[in-house]
Structures are given as structure tokens and as C-alpha cells.
Regions:
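Active-site neighborhoods and metal-handling regions in enzymes and metal-associated proteins
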Residues: 1-228
Length: 228
């Protein structure tokens, strides 16, 4: 919160629908909307951080799932597959395509790898409001839904479970968990359509710099797919 305010912006989540915090912090089998607490993280955990910001009258919304120490190869594959599906979805955000083109690209990539695609939670348009039309589900049929036009801005955010797609909503009114208590991951980018093609408004580069990851190498194939 201090960093956001120091950069002349306001927390986008704090107080939104009465949410009590600046960040959504969701470890392991929490899918989204986790409320920060003081429980220590352990080697092998994963944790998704979702952050919203309001600056100059417009919202940004962004999420990344971090790994803590050494994780299993099974969890690494889940992370890789979900992140790949984010970029495959972004590739479909072009003039003349429809919401279902993004949805089916994300769904097919994850389900073909054996993962559950959450149904109850979706991506969305954004701008002067945090959640605007259209909804961007991570499941659907190619060619269905609202047609994309230049100038649209959307948040694409795969929420992918290692096991079942089913989730439970906890009594705190916010936290969503996988029904089978297997891990879940969440990645999110904001994308504008300019000249009929996707333009990223968010970046993971600051995260990659902090973690010592060479982001260009990691994402090269994904951006090649988008540009082609």
C-alpha cells in the first residue's frame, strides 16, 4: 500500500466490495481472494499475489504465482502450463475475434494437460471501473461471445487447478479454495487492443528482475506466437 501511494496511485482492492486488504494473497490450494495473514510459508509452497491499482482515474489488475524454494516437478508443470495459456489467450485478443476464442485457447491448453479450469471466476474488461464488460471466462467455445474491437481493454487471468475444477467459498466471504485441496495457480495481464492487435499494459519484468529470471528468454516463444 505504501509503495502504491508513494507512486501517486490508490490501492484498487482496499475497500472494494468491502475487501479488507490491498493485496489478495492466496497460497497453495487457495485459488484467489485470500486475505493476508502471518502464517509462515514453507519450502515447496506456492503463493499467488493479485494487486489492483487506481491511477489517473483508471484501474490496473495484475497477478502472479510465486514459488517458495524448491517445488515439485508436478507443481512446476502446473505453473508453466497456466502461464503458457495466458499468452495463448492474449494471442487471440485481436480485431474480429470473440471472447470464446480466448476462452477456448486457455481451456484447451490446460485441460489437455490434465488440469481443472475454474468456472466460477473469470477475467473481465477494465477501465474506469475495476470490473467492466465483457467477462472473459477461461473456458468456452471458439467463435462465441462478444466481438473484440479496437480500443478495448481486458484482464485475462487463468485460474488453474492441479486437480478438480471445483472450488469452495470460505466463510470469511472472500477466500476461494480448491475442493480437493490440491494446488491452484493464477496469472493475470491487462491487455489493450491497438491497431487490431494485443498490447500488454502490464508486465512481469519487475518480478523477473527481482528473482533473477531472464524474462525475454522465458517468454520468447509466447511472444513469437502472438506476433505471428
Amino acid at each position: 500500500e505504501e509503495f502504491i501511494r508513494d507512486n501517486d496511485a490508490e490501492p484498487g482492492f482496499l475497500g472494494m466490495y468491502d475487501f479488507p486488504n490491498t493485496l489478495c494473497v492466496s497460497p497453495n490450494y487457495e485459488v484467489v481472494h485470500g486475505i493476508p495473514n502471518k502464517k509462515p510459508l514453507q519450502d515447496g509452497d506456492i503463493i499467488s499475489i493479485d494487486c489492483g491499482v487506481l491511477k489517473n482515474g483508471f484501474y490496473g489488475d495484475h497477478a502472479y504465482t510465486f514459488k517458495i524454494g524448491e517445488i515439485t516437478t508436478e507443481i512446476q508443470k502446473l505453473l508453466d502450463t497456466a502461464l503458457e495459456s495466458l499468452y495463448l489467450g492474449i494471442r487471440e485478443f485481436k480485431e474480429g475475434n470473440r471472447v470464446g476464442d480466448i476462452s477456448s485457447a486457455i481451456q484447451n491448453h490446460n485441460e489437455s494437460n490434465g488440469y481443472g479450469v475454474v468456472r466460477e471466476l473469470v477475467g473481465h474488461g477494465l477501465g474506469k471501473d475495476l470490473h467492466e464488460s465483457p467477462e472473459i471466462p477461461n473456458f468456452g467455445k471458439k467463435g462465441n461471445g462478444k466481438k473484440f474491437v479496437n480500443g478495448m481493454v481486458i484482464a485475462i487471468e487463468p485460474m488453474i487447478n492441479m486437480g478438480t475444477e471445483k472450488v469452495n467459498f470460505l466463510s470469511d466471504g472472500w477466500t476461494v479454495e480448491t475442493a480437493d485441496k490440491l494446488p491452484s495457480v493464477h496469472f493475470e495481464h491487462d491487455v489493450a487492443m491497438i491497431d487490431g492487435k494485443p498490447l500488454l499494459l502490464s508486465t512481469f519484468d519487475f518480478i523477473y528482475d527481482a528473482l533473477g529470471i531472464k524474462s525475454n528468454e522465458e517468454n520468447e516463444f509466447k511472444w513469437n506466437e502472438i506476433s505471428n
